[in-house]
Amino acid sequence: MARRPHNAPPQRETGPRVNERIRCPEVRLIGANGENIGVVTPSRAMMMAEEAGLDLVEISPNAEPPVCKIMDFGKFKYEQQKREAEARKKQHIIEIKEIKFRPGTDTHDYDVKMRSVLKFLSEGDKVKVTLRFRGREMAHQELGLELLNRVAAHVSEAEAGKVEAMPKLEGRQMVMMIAPK
C-alpha cells in the first residue's frame, strides 16, 4: 500500500457498500435468484448471504428502505468493468483534421489532398480546410473562394460529408469546416 501524505484526506471508497459496511436499521432484500424476500434487518440478510456463500451488496442506497441483493460481489464488479470497457470501446471521439491548400494548388496535389479529406470524413472526423494566402495573393481572393467551392462540390458529389461552415476569411487565410454525413 502506498503512503499518503499526512495532510491528504483519507481515500473515499467508491461503489456499492458490501456486507458489514451496510449500516441501516432495515433493508429490502432480493435473493440470489432475483426473488423478492422482503424487508429484513441487515444482520438477518448477512446470515442468509453467508448461508448461500455469497455477499450482501447494496444495489439502491437511496431507496426507502435501501435495496440489497445477495450475489457474488467479485463477479458483479467484473461484469461492471466489462460493461464500462465495452462502452468506452464503442464511443468515438470526433477529431478535427486540417488540410491546407494554397491558391495555386495544382491538380495532382489537389487530388492527393482530396483523397485525405475523403478518408478523414469516412473515418468520422471533421475536416478543416484552410486556404493560405501569401503576399499579392490576397488581391485574388476570388481564386481561393473558387478552390474552396470546388472542394465543397467534390465532397458533396462523393456524398462523404456536408459543409458545416462556409468559407470565411480569417486574417491571411480562408477557412471552411466539413462534417461527415
Swiss-Prot record:
GO molecular function ontology, one term from the record: translation initiation factor activity
Cellular localisation: Cytoplasm
Keyword Cell wall biogenesis/degradation applies: no
Gene Ontology cellular-component terms listed: cytosol; membrane
Record-level GO BP terms: ribosome disassembly
UniProt xrefs under PROSITE patterns: IF3
Keywords: Cytoplasm, Initiation factor, Protein biosynthesis
Pfam families cross-referenced by the UniProt entry: IF3_C, IF3_N
Principal subcellular localisation of the protein: cytoplasm
InterPro entries linked to this entry: T_IF-3_C_sf (IPR036788), T_IF-3_N_sf (IPR036787), Translation_initiation_fac3_CS (IPR019813), Translation_initiation_fac_3 (IPR001288), Translation_initiation_fac_3_C (IPR019815), Translation_initiation_fac_3_N (IPR019814)
Family annotation (PANTHER family): TRANSLATION INITIATION FACTOR IF-3, TRANSLATION INITIATION FACTOR IF-3, MITOCHONDRIAL
Role noted for this protein: IF-3 binds to the 30S ribosomal subunit and shifts the equilibrium between 70S ribosomes and their 50S and 30S subunits in favor of the free subunits, thus enhancing the availability of 30S subunits on which protein synthesis initiation begins.
Oligomeric and partner information: Monomer.
UniProt similarity note: Belongs to the IF-3 family.
Protein name: Translation initiation factor IF-3
